[in-house]
A protein has these predicted regions:
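C-terminal recognition in membrane/secretory proteostasis and scaffolding
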Residues: 1-42, 67, 146, 178, ...
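Active-site loop architecture of trypsin-fold serine endopeptidases
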Residues: 4, 49, 53, 130-133, ...
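Glycine-biased strand-turn-strand hairpin within the trypsin-fold
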Residues: 28-120, 128-134, 141-142, 214-227, ...
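Short, surface-exposed secondary-structure boundary micro-motifs
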Residues: 82, 125, 188-189, 254, ...
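Gly/Ser-enriched beta-turn/beta-hairpin loop segments
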Residues: 87-104, 148-154, 194-199, 209-226, ...
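Gly/Ser-rich catalytic serine loop of serine hydrolases
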Residues: 103-111, 169-173, 226-242, 318-328
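Conserved active-site neighborhood of the chymotrypsin/trypsin-like protease fold
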Residues: 106-108, 113-195, 313, 345-346, ...
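Conserved positions in beta-strands of structured domains
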Residues: 112-114, 125-127, 146-149, 207, ...
């Protein structure tokens, strides 16, 4: 009996020694949790933990694009126009006579304020022919706008509104763009259609640079265009294309699309071109026309053979106006223009594009071939009065 009792005691001691570290460790853990204001029950997720996790997710959603959109958004405006068009109306039911009567057409576009004085950039095609222009800001304020000037060839217009505490955007540098970098297109295409006056935002990248297009039927020449896959449509035409810093790098202008919807090929006028036109329009109310004083024509095989030219690249000077800048700088009929301001000239289209960005006061460096020898002539761009 005593022997069995001793054995039982020994077994209990062994069991105690085996399980004591585990019990001690659990008690230590409990004491540590208690010292931190926690308990085993609170190790499960609490409501506050969920809120903290939600805050982290929310903060992680903020990035360079959302920041850029917030910076530029207040300066983006809706441009609402009324254009009057004369339409024919039958004078009587049984007679083939018609009267021309005015008919108002409402148009919608976008724009961006670029100065605290209330100057706005938009496309010329948005406001051309408008009899009434109303601008709506993102804070719902509405202003009647005045056209300061239109640069039709570059499809740029400057408007002016009068108001206090106007938001405005900063210009970037379109000569410092990188293919593949983020591009953000904004516009306010809804105007009076919806109550919300906030602009729409679409995101893409700079797809290509320096896209040139020949003069279209409206007399517009698009040069050095910025191509982007950020969605551009008729409503955000005139709105800004911005970089990740919220700086304007272009003005949304048109898309390539048979259906009219965005298919990832949109084009914006580079902001450096816009700045040049805007300064001219604000100072003079128009784009001053340049007097060159010479005309050119395409080369053909007959001309090339007669002048012993090795190729058909270049344009032939076929007329020089007396006492013109061209005449004063020594340009002559029969000269072959092969370069203008560093741009290779192969035909008259190249020549038109090369001079489209030139303003009064600029110097024009013209590379020519005369009697087979290369020469350079510097022509001063003066206003055509």
């Amino acid at each position: 009996m005593n022997r069995n009792f001793v054995v039982l005691i020994l077994v209990l001691i062994v069991i105690a020694l085996l399980f004591y570290p585990v019990i001690f460790k659990n008690r230590e853990t409990a004491r540590n949790l208690d010292s931190k204001g926690l308990s085993v029950d609170t190790l499960q997720e609490r409501p506050n933990d969920k809120e903290l996790r939600t805050d982290k997710i929310r903060s992680s959603r903020r990035n360079a694009i959302t920041n850029a959109a917030e910076i530029i958004e207040p300066a983006v405006v809706s441009v609402n126009v009324i254009k009057t068009k004369m339409v024919k109306r039958r004078r009587g039911f049984f007679f083939g006579f018609y009267d021309e009567v005015p008919y108002n057409i409402q148009g919608i576009g976008s724009g961006v304020i670029f100065s605290k004085d209330g100057f706005i950039i938009t496309n010329a095609h948005v406001v051309e022919g408008a009899t009434e222009i109303k601008v709506i800001l993102t804070d719902t304020r509405q202003f009647d706008a005045k056209v300061i000037g239109i640069d039709k060839s570059h499809d740029i217009s400057v408007l002016k509104i009068n108001g206090n505490n106007l938001p405005y955007a900063k210009f970037g540098d379109s000569d410092d763009l990188i293919i593949g970098e983020w591009a953000i297109a904004l516009g306010n295409p809804y105007g009076f259609l919806i109550k919300d006056s906030k602009p729409s935002v679409s995101v893409g990248v700079i797809s290509a640079l320096n896209r040139d297009f020949a003069e279209n039927n409206d007399g517009k020449i698009y040069r050095h265009m910025v191509q982007t896959d950020a969605a551009i449509n008729s409503g955000n035409s005139g709105g800004p294309l911005v970089n990740i810093y919220g700086e304007i790098i272009g003005i949304n202008t048109f898309i390539f699309s048979e259906s009219g919807g965005n298919i990832g090929i949109g084009f914006a006028i580079p902001i450096n071109t816009v700045k040049k036109s805007a300064r001219e329009l604000i100072e003079y109310g128009k784009i001053r026309q340049i007097w060159f004083g010479f005309k050119v024509q395409e080369l053909n095989q007959l001309i090339a053979s007669h002048l012993k030219l090795k190729s058909l690249d270049g344009v032939l000077v076929n007329y020089i106006q007396r006492k013109s800048p061209a005449a004063l700088t020594g340009l002559k009929e029969g000269d072959i223009v092969v370069e203008i301001n560093g741009n290779t000239i192969k035909d008259t289209r190249d020549a038109e594009l090369a001079v489209s960005d030139i303003s009064v006061g600029d110097k024009i460096r013209i590379g020519i071939l005369r009697d087979g020898k290369p020469l350079e002539i510097v022509l001063n761009a003066v206003e055509n009065r």
